[in-house]
C-alpha cells in the first residue's frame, strides 16, 4: 500500500486528489507544521527536506509534487493524465507543472517562508508585501495564456488540474483579486464538482 504524508493547506493536497482520482489504496498521514512535526526525526527519516508531500512506495520514497503526480498516473495506468499518447502534449504537461513548481509556488512561499531567502526581518516583510503583486503577475499568465478550459489543457483532465487547483486555493490569502480571474475560478468550480476533490478535501482540510 502507498503511504502519503501531507499537511493541511499544503501543496500535498494535489497528490491526494490524484490518488482519489485513480482509486488508489493508500494511507494518509497528516503532519502538524505548527508543532514542527516535519522537522522531527521520524519524518526526517522519510524526507530529509522536511516538506510535503512524500510518498512511500514499494520501491522507495518519492518527493516533489510533479514527480509524485507523474508516478501516480503511470502506476495506475492512467496514461491520459500525463499525455502519454503525444510527445508534445506530454511535454506541455511537464512545462505547465514546472512553471507551477518553480515560479508560482515560489512566489507564494515569499508570504510564509521568507526566512528561506533572508534572515533580515525588514527583507522578510518586504517579501510579504510583494506577494499580492508577484502572485497576480504569475497567475495572470495562466489565466490569459495557459489555461485552455475547462481543464488546463482543454477537454482532457490531466495531472496539472489538481496541482493548479491546490495553488489557486491560496490566491485569496495571497491578496490576489480572484474576481479578475474568471477562467481560473471556473476551473476551481470544475474541480470542486469532482468526487475525488471532495474526498481529498474531507481528509485534509
Regions found by a protein language model. Give the residues of each.
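GST-like domain detector, emphasizing the conserved glutathione-binding G-site
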Residues: 1-126
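Residue-level recognition of oxygen-bearing side chains
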Residues: 67, 183, 196
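Exported/periplasmic ABC-transporter solute-binding proteins
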Residues: 199, 203-204
Amino acid at each position: 500500500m502507498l503511504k502519503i504524508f501531507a499537511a493541511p493547506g499544503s501543496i500535498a493536497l494535489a497528490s491526494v486528489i490524484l490518488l482519489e482520482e485513480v482509486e488508489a489504496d493508500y494511507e494518509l498521514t497528516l503532519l502538524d507544521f505548527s508543532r514542527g512535526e516535519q522537522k522531527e526525526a521520524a519524518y526526517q527519516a522519510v524526507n530529509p527536506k522536511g516538506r510535503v508531500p512524500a510518498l512511500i512506495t514499494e520501491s522507495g520514497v518519492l518527493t516533489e509534487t510533479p514527480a509524485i503526480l507523474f508516478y501516480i498516473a503511470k502506476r495506475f495506468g492512467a496514461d491520459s493524465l500525463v499525455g502519454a499518447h503525444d510527445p508534445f502534449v506530454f511535454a506541455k504537461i511537464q512545462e505547465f507543472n514546472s512553471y507551477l513548481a518553480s515560479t508560482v509556488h515560489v512566489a507564494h512561499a515569499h508570504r510564509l517562508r521568507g526566512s528561506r531567502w533572508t534572515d533580515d526581518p525588514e527583507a522578510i516583510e518586504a517579501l510579504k508585501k510583494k506577494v499580492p503583486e508577484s502572485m497576480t503577475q504569475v497567475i495572470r499568465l495562466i489565466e490569459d495564456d495557459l489555461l485552455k478550459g475547462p481543464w488546463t489543457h482543454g477537454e482532457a483532465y490531466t495531472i496539472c488540474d489538481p496541482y493548479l487547483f491546490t495553488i489557486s486555493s491560496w490566491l485569496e490569502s495571497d491578496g490576489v483579486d480572484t474576481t479578475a480571474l474568471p477562467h481560473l475560478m471556473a476551473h476551481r468550480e470544475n474541480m470542486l464538482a469532482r468526487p475525488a476533490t471532495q474526498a481529498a478535501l474531507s481528509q485534509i482540510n
